[in-house]
């Protein structure tokens, strides 16, 4: 009989091993066997929990997305209630420590690439894109007319993605302070233009 709670412990262990494997070997070098080896368990156990490599990547990205959504919620709740503060909180969540470690950044890059070929991953990416746009639009709509709020949300989402992508591809630790300053300046510009 399995130990109570072992399933979640094992899944977390395997997701961590997947993040490390993608960090060290990339997605092509990440296999059920490489993940099992990093987790010190059998390949059969990885198969039991995730089925195949696609299932493992999907579960890993769901974990990363939950971390992003938790950081977004936590920062929005802690922010002052004005749109500027809440927009800054959303931006900061995208550059949260849970999103900018080397293993997570490389996993995001692998996920984006693979989502163009896998329907489930494409759906996850679509949900994430819509959620970001919706959150930004809701805050901009408190200060701007509806059409301008939508346009501002699209622009800020593109800026977040662009700053994050440039940081991920820079080859070293991401300069979150510089990224946040650029995004904050953009928010200030948009809110001042109304």
UniProtKB/Swiss-Prot annotation:
It comes from the Bacteria. PROSITE patterns: HTH_TETR_1, HTH_TETR_2. Pathway: Amine and polyamine biosynthesis; betaine biosynthesis via choline pathway [regulation]. Residues 31-50 bind DNA. Coiled coil: none annotated. Repressor involved in the biosynthesis of the osmoprotectant glycine betaine. It represses transcription of the choline transporter BetT and the genes of BetAB involved in the synthesis of glycine betaine. Residues 8-68 form the HTH tetR-type domain. Keywords: DNA-binding, Repressor, Transcription, Transcription regulation. Signal peptide: none annotated. GO terms for molecular function: DNA-binding transcription factor activity; transcription cis-regulatory region binding. GO terms for biological process: glycine betaine biosynthetic process from choline; negative regulation of DNA-templated transcription. This is HTH-type transcriptional regulator BetI. Pfam families: TetR_C_6 (PF13977), TetR_N (PF00440).
């Amino acid at each position: 009989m399995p130990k109570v709670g072992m399933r979640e412990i094992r899944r977390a262990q395997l997701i961590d091993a997947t993040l490390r494997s993608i960090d060290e070997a990339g997605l092509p070098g990440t296999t059920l066997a490489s993940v099992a080896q990093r987790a010190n368990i059998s390949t059969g156990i990885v198969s039991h929990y995730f089925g195949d490599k696609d299932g493992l990547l999907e579960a890993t990205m769901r974990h990363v997305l939950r971390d992003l959504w938790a950081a977004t919620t936590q920062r929005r709740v802690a922010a002052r209630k004005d749109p500027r503060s809440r927009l800054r909180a959303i931006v900061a969540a995208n550059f949260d420590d849970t999103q900018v470690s080397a293993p997570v950044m490389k996993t995001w890059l692998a996920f984006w690439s693979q989502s163009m070929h896998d329907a489930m991953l494409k759906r996850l990416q679509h949900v994430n894109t819509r959620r970001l746009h919706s959150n930004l639009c809701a805050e901009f709509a408190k200060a701007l007319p509806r059409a301008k709020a939508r346009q501002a949300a699209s622009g800020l989402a593109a800026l977040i993605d662009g700053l994050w992508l440039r940081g991920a591809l820079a080859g070293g630790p991401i300069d979150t302070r510089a990224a946040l300053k650029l995004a904050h300046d953009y928010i200030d510009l948009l809110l001042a233009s109304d």
